[in-house]
């Protein structure tokens, strides 16, 4: 994604790295960034067809990464940028983080029929639709104009609220299983929580109107979490979320039938 939209791509490199351990209830306190680029001093006129100039990639990606890190309050103790002609065709953007949490905060159980899944955090938009395949497919001369929507739009303040909520033992102990929203959106993040699920896409909170069922199912909009809790704990968990100024909505129910069904 950094190759297509360097600011948002580098920002979600860090944001995505934070969300992975966060779904395991870990608080991230340190980061590392390693990138690869061709010569940024090369004249713009010598830029490969269909590519952004290396200078644009290098400076804008650094701004995107630092913007997200500053807003969420995360220190990046190691930053290295490698320069090699081989990165002219495709930039390298690697982020790594370190996190930890008290073992007493973590509860891991198999969700049971009747349990509910709460969508927590950011709202859903068209940003990130197709991102899972976009990061791996071959890019063409037209990619800069056609693939921008595949890059997720980060929202660090919401992720910081998620971090605050997940540092609360009373909230974390209610969570049986949790998933962050990466590749595949609702279909994967919620679909992986249990073998049997009934997902109501109409209840997914939206950034704006006009999204169809497919977009709601596969959008990779960031700063969202899916948590499975017992039905009797749902109201309490959503109260804790509201105390951290986070939106929380029940969007799915765990079923006995071992099949995922999405309705819209």
What are these regions (language model features)?
Residues 1-264:
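Glycine/proline-enriched, intrinsically flexible loops and inter-domain linkers
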């Amino acid at each position: 994604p950094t190759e297509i939209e360097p600011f948002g791509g580098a920002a979600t490199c860090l944001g995505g790295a934070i969300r992975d351990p966060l779904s395991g209830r870990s608080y991230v306190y340190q980061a590392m960034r390693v990138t690869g680029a061709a010569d940024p001093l090369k004249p713009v006129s010598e830029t490969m067809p269909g590519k952004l100039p290396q200078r644009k990639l290098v400076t804008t990606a650094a701004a995107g990464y630092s913007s997200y890190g500053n807003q969420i309050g995360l220190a990046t103790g190691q930053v290295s940028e490698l320069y090699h002609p081989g990165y002219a065709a495709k930039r390298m953007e690697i982020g790594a983080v370190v996190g930890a949490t008290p073992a007493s905060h973590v509860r891991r159980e198999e969700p049971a029929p009747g349990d509910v899944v709460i969508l927590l955090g950011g709202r859903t938009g068209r940003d990130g639709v197709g991102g899972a395949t976009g990061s791996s497919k071959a890019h063409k001369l037209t990619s800069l104009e056609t693939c921008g929507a595949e890059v997720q739009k980060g929202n660090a303040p919401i992720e910081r609220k998620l971090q605050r909520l997940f540092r609360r033992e009373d909230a974390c102990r209610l969570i049986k299983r949790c998933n962050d929203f990466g590749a595949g959106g609702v279909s994967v993040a919620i679909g992986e929580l249990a073998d049997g699920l009934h997902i109501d896409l109409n209840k997914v909170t939206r950034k704006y109107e006009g999204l169809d069922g497919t977009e709601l199912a596969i959008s990779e909009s960031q700063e969202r979490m899916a948590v499975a809790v017992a039905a009797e704990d749902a109201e309490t968990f959503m109260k804790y979320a509201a105390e951290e100024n986070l939106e929380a909505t029940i969007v799915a129910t765990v079923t006995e039938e071992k099949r995922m069904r999405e309705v819209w």
